[in-house]
């Protein structure tokens, strides 16, 4: 259909109106065309180009995906609560549940929440810009995640599911081992998720480099802003490698290529190199935004500026660079040359240096400060303790000779859940409890939030600490049965999982009460007593010059009518 609004000519039918709006109304009412304008609600939430609304959508999506991923994890722990078959007789189904749990939590819970949710909501505020650099690109970045999630759900529920683990290693992901369409759907879902992340990363980088207000130099940017830009660079550099690897798996499965088929001259180890060249930066993509949040929260909760701001920035940069140089520590058992293993051991141990700088800087920020144990501060301190434990088990696994024994045991599961399930997730909750009054303009029950922290803290520790002992006894991961000797620690671990689910349910009740009974909050709800909460001097000295606290709660759709200036 051709509509020429200049000549008022629609498919040969002439109208006598002069203005564009009247023209469109007549076109809508003409018998051969039905076009319904979106309602205000649809336009705000489906067609949004506002960073705050898109950030809210990301957080809602992450909450839904997190509940799905938690449900899968409980199924795993219920099956492992005793030796023999408990609930899941089919090992392929068990492996499909493990794959679904990992992918839901990594790609659809942590990344959308930490990068998409907090990144979109806060970044324009932190740089003093009106919005993101590419608002409509921002919208498609979010809406690509919805079909991506649907593809993963379909892949888990049709035929035998994708029982490959999140790593998708061939030949297990090849056409002979997984003959149905499940793995293909999972690969398409990963492609969509990757495109979404790359578009978002380009948007974040452009926003930070081009939309800062005068006076907000890069060396004055809040640490969360630095965390987002470093994460975005990691995404841009690593995701294309994953896309290439899984596309080769796709063509091996469907077009008879032999990239990873030994019979045709391919090499499955090549896929492991490609996957982990993405996979190791990916774990830093998950945790670096958490570093930014924890720095902000500890500064606010201590009443001090962050100790060693520049050191924190360059530590994050170092972690990002080194993250690309250590991928083969996931592959010590594939037959690497001894010199290669020596290099990857040394490089992996070096990553502990910038990580240690960050941990000691957080402790130094707390030292001598007036600590306020608000819910976000509790989660931040919990993060520091648990992330340190996870880092120490990582130092053990970095050694090639030890990892040959620990590879694919529950020691590895315990290690990465301490840095993710208690690192990234505790950072997420810390950021949620710090900024959700700003986002919604409503207060929540602080006592209930502290109870949530303690239930979750006990639950996750009871779940994952015993897994270190199972790993030391060499219990293999991704296997649904085990000898009776492992029964005790597995039962404890499963009880901890149920406690974590109770904590998650309790968290949902806190959100419900906040939305139904929450009172309106001031610009800076964390200042006690709230006598001078609108005074700029107080806001800046109390919270490390973060601009978002100068705005109303919730901020207006376009926060800055004129550019803020920072001297």
From Swiss-Prot:
It is found in: Mitochondrion inner membrane. Component of the cytochrome c oxidase, the last enzyme in the mitochondrial electron transport chain which drives oxidative phosphorylation. The respiratory chain contains 3 multisubunit complexes succinate dehydrogenase (complex II, CII), ubiquinol-cytochrome c oxidoreductase (cytochrome b-c1 complex, complex III, CIII) and cytochrome c oxidase (complex IV, CIV), that cooperate to transfer electrons derived from NADH and succinate to molecular oxygen, creating an electrochemical gradient over the inner membrane that drives transmembrane transport and the ATP synthase. Mg(2+) binds at residues 407-408. It is a multi-pass membrane protein. Cu cation binds at residues 280, 329-330. One of its GO terms (biological process) is electron transport coupled proton transport. The chain crosses the membrane at residues 56-76, 103-123, 139-159, 185-205, 221-241, 274-294, 306-326, 344-364, 377-397, 416-436, 451-471, 491-511. GO terms for cellular component: mitochondrial inner membrane; respiratory chain complex IV. Its EC number is 7.1.1.9. Disulfide bonds: none annotated. Pathway: Energy metabolism; oxidative phosphorylation. Keywords: Calcium, Copper, Electron transport, Heme, Iron, Magnesium, Membrane, Metal-binding, Mitochondrion, Mitochondrion inner membrane, Respiratory chain, Translocase, Transmembrane, Transmembrane helix, Transport. This is Cytochrome c oxidase subunit 1. It comes from Emericella nidulans. Belongs to the heme-copper respiratory oxidase family. Binds 2 heme A groups non-covalently per subunit. Binds a copper B center.
